[in-house]
Amino acid sequence: MIRTMLQGKLHRVKVTQADLHYEGSCAIDQDFLEAAGILEYEAIDIYNVDNGQRFSTYAIAAERGSRIISVNGAAARCACVGDKLIICSYVQMSDADARQHRPKVGYFEGDNHLQRKAKAVPVQVA
């Protein structure tokens, strides 16, 4: 059996740019890509916390240390500067590997300050 698992997640990053006329993609600070284990040109899903939109694109690298999150091309219609996003990548693996797998998660606050890194999403409690 093959399972699709969360590989990496950038939790609550803030959109710094939205460029409708740029060639597709989402530009992400290289430090952020590394924090979540996301590769340049990798498929990503984006969940907009502010408006509820969910869309897919691919990651490209933005300047290291810039804190840039730029939603480009048609996807720019799905996010505005200042919106909070959750950016995820997924990986497929065997059932046995999936049971041992832990995603790379980066938690952000303010103007895209990496607050902490984790190897799991916390258990939700009542």
From Swiss-Prot:
Signal peptide: none
Entry's EC annotation: 4.1.1.11
Record keyword Lyase present: yes
Biological pathway: Cofactor biosynthesis; (R)-pantothenate biosynthesis; beta-alanine from L-aspartate: step 1/1
Modified residues (Pyruvic acid (Ser)): 25
CDD domains in the cross-refs: Asp_decarbox (cd06919)
GO cellular component terms, A-Z: cytosol
GO molecular function: aspartate 1-decarboxylase activity
Binding site for substrate: 57, 73-75
Keyword Lyase: yes
Post-translational modification: Is synthesized initially as an inactive proenzyme, which is activated by self-cleavage at a specific serine bond to produce a beta-subunit with a hydroxyl group at its C-terminus and an alpha-subunit with a pyruvoyl group at its N-terminus.
UniProt cross-references to Pfam families, sorted A to Z: Asp_decarbox
InterPro entries with a match to the protein in the record: Asp_de-COase-like_dom_sf, Asp_decarbox
Residues at the catalytic site: 25 (schiff-base intermediate with substrate), 58 (proton donor)
Any Gene Ontology biological process: alanine biosynthetic process
Cell compartments where the protein resides: Cytoplasm
Cofactor note: Binds 1 pyruvoyl group covalently per subunit.
Catalytic activity: L-aspartate + H(+) = beta-alanine + CO2
Family: Belongs to the PanD family.
HAMAP family xref list: PanD
Role: Catalyzes the pyruvoyl-dependent decarboxylation of aspartate to produce beta-alanine.
Subunit relationships: Heterooctamer of four alpha and four beta subunits.
Protein name: Aspartate 1-decarboxylase
Protein's organism: Serratia proteamaculans (strain 568)
Gene (UniProt): panD
